[in-house]
Amino acid sequence: MILGIGVDLVCTRRIQALIAKYGNKFTNRIFSEKEILDSLKYRDEYARARHFAKRFAAKEAYVKALGLGFGRGVEAKDISVHNDPYGQPMISLEGGALRNGHVKLSMSDDGDYAIAFVTLHT
């Protein structure tokens, strides 16, 4: 049974501009340590921004699927996006983001945009 769905679209250039303006202050506030470490494999600043844009979209899609928003008991860092050994995107949850049910995540990007779609189900 589907408990919730969420989708979010993020402009990679917007994330790139936020990183340029705020640097680690932005990434440390929004992303988990693992997400930040995973981003270090990208030497190109735009590729790194694309990595973060997809994860930001996934976090937003997840809270939309919950029917909440950030700051209502769920913080962005409570949601960590990574890939399983086969490359499938996964969400790990901590703190206020922990909820009953299973999470399915799909992410993609094209040009300057990243999109994520989340379903919560029993």
From Swiss-Prot:
Cytoplasm is among the record's keywords: yes
Catalytic activity: apo-[ACP] + CoA = holo-[ACP] + adenosine 3',5'-bisphosphate + H(+)
Main location: cytoplasm
Record-linked Gene3D superfamilies: 4'-phosphopantetheinyl transferase domain (3.90.470.20)
InterPro entries tied to this protein: 4-PPantetheinyl_Trfase_dom, 4-PPantetheinyl_Trfase_dom_sf, ACPS, P-Pant_transferase_sf, Ppantetheine-prot_Trfase_dom
Annotated SUPFAM superfamilies: 4'-phosphopantetheinyl transferase
Catalytic EC class: transferase
Keywords assigned by UniProt, alphabetized: Cytoplasm, Fatty acid biosynthesis, Fatty acid metabolism, Lipid biosynthesis, Lipid metabolism, Magnesium, Metal-binding, Transferase
MF annotations from Gene Ontology: holo-[acyl-carrier-protein] synthase activity; magnesium ion binding
GO CC, any one term: cytosol
Keyword Lipid metabolism carried by entry: yes
One Pfam short name: ACPS
GO BP annotation list: fatty acid biosynthetic process; lysine biosynthetic process via aminoadipic acid
Cofactor dependency: Mg(2+)
Residue sites binding Mg(2+) per the record: 8, 60
Entry's EC annotation: 2.7.8.7
Compartment(s) where it occurs, according to its Swiss-Prot or TrEMBL record: Cytoplasm
Function: Transfers the 4'-phosphopantetheine moiety from coenzyme A to a Ser of acyl-carrier-protein.
NCBIfam families cross-referenced by the UniProt entry: acpS, pantethn_trn, PRK14659.1
Similarity annotation: Belongs to the P-Pant transferase superfamily. AcpS family.
UniProt-recorded name of the protein: Holo-[acyl-carrier-protein] synthase
UniProt source species: Anaplasma phagocytophilum (strain HZ)
Lineage: Bacteria, Pseudomonadati, Pseudomonadota, Alphaproteobacteria, Rickettsiales
Gene: acpS
